[in-house]
Amino acid sequence: MAATTLSIATTIRSSSFSSGLASAHHFPSRPLSIEFPFSFGVSSSSTLSHRAIYLHPISAVKTPKKIKKIGSEISSLTLEESRILVDYVQDKFGVSILFSAPAAAALPPPLDNGGATASVERQTTFDVVINDVPRGNRIAVITAIRAMTSLSLSESKELIEGFPKKFKEGVTKDEAEEDKTQLEEAGAKVSIV
């Protein structure tokens, strides 16, 4: 931090010294000021201050035209072109997209020369759908739903009104079977899609 002048004001009162010393020396009645000669390129009339930089929230920053153009071009790509783009970016910049593995599993396999898929894929993720809940079993089903999820009471009630409703999406076969068993034991009619 640059400082142009450092002033130290001292008031020396004769009462703080012994009477013999005070009478031997003359002390000024106004404070002393000590000035240092360094200025670091700042004028002597300036004062020190803190500077703050205001940063706009990300949502308030204007998107450049170049970025908008790239975004619109990417959004118009087909699935096959998107896969090729991802491979290109991975090779070009040496990155891997591990965090989007579930999304990559949803992409269709590459096509053979004949246009047919290379192999038939098995379904790896399933949805648990509640088809119906009889009136006499509503409380038991709501209790089962709350035990299996972190839903509130009102959210659980909404889930058993108006059928069919998806209870869970994108779960493994074992988890889907377990959820189906628990809901059926509570009295709900459930299917796995």
UniProtKB/Swiss-Prot annotation:
GO biological processes: translation
Chain intervals for the UniProt region annotation (Disordered): 170-193
Membrane-traversing stretches: none
GO molecular function terms attached to this record: structural constituent of ribosome
GO-annotated cellular components: chloroplast; plastid large ribosomal subunit
Cystine connections: none
Pfam families listed in its UniProt record: Ribosomal_L12 (PF00542), Ribosomal_L12_N (PF16320)
Cellular localisation: Plastid, Chloroplast
Top-level taxon: Eukaryota
Entry keywords, A to Z: Chloroplast, Plastid, Ribonucleoprotein, Ribosomal protein, Transit peptide
Keyword Cytoplasm: no
InterPro entries: Ribosomal_bL12 (IPR000206), Ribosomal_bL12_C (IPR013823), Ribosomal_bL12_C/ClpS-like (IPR014719), Ribosomal_bL12_oligo (IPR008932), Ribosomal_bL12_oligo_N_sf (IPR036235)
PANTHER family, per the entry: 39S RIBOSOMAL PROTEIN L12, LARGE RIBOSOMAL SUBUNIT PROTEIN BL12CY
Protein name as it appears in the record: Large ribosomal subunit protein bL12cy
Organism: Arabidopsis thaliana
Taxonomic lineage: Eukaryota, Viridiplantae, Streptophyta, Embryophyta, Tracheophyta
